[in-house]
């Protein structure tokens, strides 16, 4: 006998997620330094290992679905992953293209809400604080928290557990908070012996740690705070991954001034400690914008 069945049958089938790189995003921009390349599980089975390729070259293998790749090459790069499956087959992600930028943004809330860091090709930003902006324009830009002074040290454990890749330490500890007229000048005013005795609080965490950022270049005669800090046997230099520098020249020096800055500040500090250098603040000091000459300096 036969049975006729009429009606509509709907079968719900869950589509397999494509094996792909999830970070960096294709045609996205990331900060130079340590870059997390992430991907999801392959579709065809479990993987015994993953082979990571950057710019067409094999760089390493891992059993994890993330790999930390280091580059300071400001350019567009490519990445793809080869999965070696337990059944002997292989599976490949599509190639993603991503840009690497050294440019960062030091910005407070009043200015930050008015800026679009993506349009400015910024790879990262900081706010002199411990929490990122909630503005959507900053959602894809890496935030780097800062322990501005001893008063914010209680945020270190939260920062470490939140997965931030970097931490900036004390901001201009070699400068006072206020000048003799009571004007705020930005220094956290941390005694160097206090900084030395507190350094253990920063060390040994999952982030890459920056040294305290001095207002006065370590290579200058006046840079005694930083040299004292780094010369202390109580500071394990292996815990310091990079050195942030600030520099404010008194006058605009054009190309010659820029070359002097690179030679006498950046190169000189690197030659002292052989640590990567981050320039986290620089400008001519004068701040005025009322004359054509001042505007030229600021715009330069």
Could you describe each region identified by the protein language model?
Residues 127, 171, 226-260, 266, ...:
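Aromatic- and acid-rich polysaccharide-binding/catalytic face
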Residues 99-132, 146-148:
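Boundary/entry segment of secreted carbohydrate-active catalytic domains
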Residues 33-37:
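Structural beta-strand segments of beta-rich domains
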Residues 50-52:
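Short beta-strand elements bearing conserved aromatic residues within extracellular beta-rich modules
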Residues 161-190, 210-218, 238-250:
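Active-site groove signature of glycoside hydrolases
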Residues 38-44:
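Acidic, Ser/Thr
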Residues 211, 216-218, 272-299:
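Active-site clefts of carbohydrate-active enzymes
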Residues 81-83:
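Conserved structural position at the C-terminal beta-strand
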């Amino acid at each position: 006998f036969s049975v006729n069945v009429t009606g509509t049958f709907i079968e719900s089938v869950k589509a397999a997620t494509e094996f792909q790189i999830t970070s960096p995003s294709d045609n996205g921009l990331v900060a130079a330094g340590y870059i997390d390349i992430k991907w999801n599980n392959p579709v065809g089975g479990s993987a015994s290992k993953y082979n990571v390729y950057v710019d067409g070259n094999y760089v390493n293998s891992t059993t994890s679905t993330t790999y930390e790749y280091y580059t300071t090459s400001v350019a567009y790069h490519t990445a793809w992953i080869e999965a070696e499956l337990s059944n002997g087959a292989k599976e490949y992600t599509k190639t993603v293209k991503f840009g690497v930028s050294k440019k960062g943004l030091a910005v407070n809330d009043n200015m930050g809400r008015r800026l679009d860091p993506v349009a400015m090709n910024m790879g990262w930003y900081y706010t002199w604080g411990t929490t990122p902006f909630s503005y959507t324009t900053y959602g894809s830009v890496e935030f780097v928290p800062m322990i501005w002074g001893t008063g914010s040290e209680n945020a270190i454990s939260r920062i470490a557990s939140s997965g931030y890749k970097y931490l900036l330490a004390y901001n201009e500890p070699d400068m006072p908070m206020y000048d003799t007229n009571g004007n705020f000048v930005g220094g956290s005013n941390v005694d160097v012996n206090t900084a030395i005795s507190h350094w253990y609080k920063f060390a040994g965490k999952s982030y890459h740690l920056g040294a305290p950022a001095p207002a006065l270049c370590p290579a200058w005669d006046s840079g005694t705070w930083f040299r004292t800090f780094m010369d202390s046997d109580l500071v394990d230099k292996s815990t310091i991954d990079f050195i942030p520098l600030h520099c404010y020249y008194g006058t605009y020096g054009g190309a010659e001034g820029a070359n002097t800055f690179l030679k006498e500040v950046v190169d000189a500090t690197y030659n002292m400690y052989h640590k990567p250098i981050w320039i986290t603040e620089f400008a001519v000091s004068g701040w005025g914008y009322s004359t054509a000459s001042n505007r030229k300096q600021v715009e330069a």
